[in-house]
Amino acid sequence: MHALQAKILDPRLGTEFPLPQYATPGSAGLDLRALLKEDTVLEPGQTLLIPTGLSVYIGDPGLAAMILPRSGLGHKHGVVLGNLVGLIDSDYQGELMVSCWNRGNTPFTITIGERIAQLILVPVVQAHFDIVEQFDETQRGTGGFGHSGTR
């Protein structure tokens, strides 16, 4: 398990609301909560930045974090991440904010302390470009967007 430095930016986190934690021993994501001042209605088509009351510092350039949606919010209520995935670089130290987008047809109320997203750690491999005149030929070549078939 990797140690992750964290700052509590909202005093309710860790007292009124639990710190991010894994729901089960097999969980990949730490639940992030909406540390709002009041319950907030997210209208259809609306996107809002929701504070989590937490900042983290990963520190290891071989790791990054991703903020991912919670499947139940998207499937049951149409609430997903406005940026689809939030990428947290290893040297970022600001508050974790969650962009919530209501793609549904009905208003959705985000309640104070509600679990709205999850944070996962992922390995990072940085690359550099080797500029070439042409690539070694492959069977696929430049075919994309369904080129390999549907079955």
Curated annotation (Swiss-Prot):
Disulfide bond sites: none
Catalytic reaction annotation: dUTP + H2O = dUMP + diphosphate + H(+)
Pfam families reported in the protein's UniProt record: dUTPase
Binding residues annotated for substrate, in chain numbering: 70-72, 83, 87-89, 97
EC number: 3.6.1.23
One record GO biological process: dUMP biosynthetic process
Cofactor entry: Mg(2+)
GO molecular function annotation: dUTP diphosphatase activity; magnesium ion binding
This protein's pathway: Pyrimidine metabolism; dUMP biosynthesis; dUMP from dCTP (dUTP route): step 2/2
Keywords: Hydrolase, Magnesium, Metal-binding, Nucleotide metabolism
Family: Belongs to the dUTPase family.
Function statement: This enzyme is involved in nucleotide metabolism: it produces dUMP, the immediate precursor of thymidine nucleotides and it decreases the intracellular concentration of dUTP so that uracil cannot be incorporated into DNA.
The protein's name in its UniProt record: Deoxyuridine 5'-triphosphate nucleotidohydrolase
Species lineage: Bacteria, Pseudomonadati, Pseudomonadota, Gammaproteobacteria, Pseudomonadales
